[in-house]
Amino acid sequence: MKNYSEDTSRQYHIQVARGEIGRYVIMPGDPGRCEKIAEYLDTPLLIASNREFTTYTGMLDGEKVSVTSTGIGGPSAAIAMEELSRCGADTFVRIGTCGGMQPEVKSGDIVIATGSIRMEGTSKEYAPIEYPAVASLEVTNALVQAAKEDGCTWHTGVVQSKDAFYGQHEPEAMPVGYELLNKWEAWKKMGCLASEMESAALFIVAGKLRARAGACFLVMANQEREKLGLENPVVHDTDMAVRTAVGAVRNLIRCDKERE
């Protein structure tokens, strides 16, 4: 593919060049979270900041590790993963926020996705809808181990990936509200844990790239608990999810070294 960057050594969107990032990348959505995550690394350095894509690189347990933000939704997340892969990355850990869908999934909990419902559009331009969006078992196990070690309350299971934030929160206002509501009820009955906006695209793109990808989320709130009259505070502190993601990368580094 032609590189449209003025500096052709750098990827067009993320403005990063080969050699500037590690094989392990932690991927928040919000560029503002990158510096906070990078503080967990040794000697973190700001590599680039362009559009929604901010990248830091530092060291963790002797390995180069990067943090790159993706913005909101599947399209920009897929762009980031594609361009990071071209720079040498092959292991991706998504960290973000989600809304709980089951009564037992409470605000402040951590959800670790084993797979995603493909209710978004990006993944459909990579693979037929019959192809499942599943996380890497290695990354998922590393996330579970990190969550256990940190002592947080965590859940593993399927999440829903959507394109429209307000389609979830105000379905009655949408011309296709009947479809959104019916599918929401179906996902709940199937045990879907939470709703977010990126993981299906990331898991499918990872499959195309033969890369490893996993995802963990802070549960900010749960509208289903609110409907049941249960406690439903809004939680904004993502530190626990960040620690889980960083801990997972540590676990992956250790396992990868043991295999060498």
Language-model segments: what does each one mean?
Residues 1-142:
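Metabolite-binding pocket within alpha/beta catalytic cores that recognizes anionic/polar moieties
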Residues 28-32, 72-79, 87, 105, ...:
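Conserved active-site and cofactor/substrate-binding residues in soluble primary-metabolism enzymes
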Residues 90-91, 193, 212:
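Short acidic/polar active-site loop segments enriched in Thr and Asp
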Residues 133-191:
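Active-site rim beta-loop-alpha module in soluble metabolic enzymes
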Residues 142-150, 205, 244-255:
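Generic non-transmembrane alpha-helical segments
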Residues 200-233:
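Zn-dependent metallopeptidase/amidohydrolase metal-coordination segment
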Residues 223-260:
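His/Asp/Glu-rich mid-to-C-terminal helical/loop segments that flank catalytic regions of hydrolases
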